[in-house]
Amino acid sequence: MLTKITFFERFEQDILSGAKTITLRNEAESHVFAGQILPVSTFEADRWFCDIKVIEVVPVLFSALTEQHAAQENMTLPELRRVIQEIYPGLEQLFQIHFCVVNTRAHPIN
């Protein structure tokens, strides 16, 4: 089970603003459960910037990604497909983790 989650720094503001409400992960990073609170850090520097609450975890195929998934990631569908292929090349089985931000203490929000 994951005890924390990381995101690339480029997604930090989208997460904090509520524009990004899902993350697509591989099976190894899908072991979270609804109601779980996770600290969130940047992938690059391991710098904490908020806590999230997991709402649900749903399996989804790369080939089944839709505009709705893209909107929840705050991207276009072509952007989302490109980003997923960069992170998980050739992977078809993904897991959608739907979340909300629950804590940003000590984080300066611009």
UniProtKB/Swiss-Prot annotation:
Annotated catalysed reactions: N(4)-acetylcytidine + H2O = cytidine + acetate + H(+); N(4)-acetyl-2'-deoxycytidine + H2O = 2'-deoxycytidine + acetate + H(+); N(4)-acetylcytosine + H2O = cytosine + acetate + H(+)
Family: Belongs to the N(4)-acetylcytidine amidohydrolase family.
Protein's recorded name: N(4)-acetylcytidine amidohydrolase
Gene Ontology MF, one: hydrolase activity, acting on carbon-nitrogen (but not peptide) bonds, in linear amidines
Function summary: Catalyzes the hydrolysis of N(4)-acetylcytidine (ac4C).
Pfam families linked to this entry: ASCH
The protein's enzyme class: hydrolase
Entries under HAMAP family matching the protein: ac4C_amidohydr
Gene Ontology, cellular component aspect: cytosol
Active site: 20 (proton acceptor), 23 (nucleophile), 73 (proton donor)
NCBIfam families found in the cross-reference section: PRK04980.1
Keywords for this protein: Hydrolase
Coiled coil: none
E.C. numbers: 3.5.1.135
ASCH domain boundaries: 6-93
Gene3D superfamilies named among the record's database cross-references: Hypothetical protein
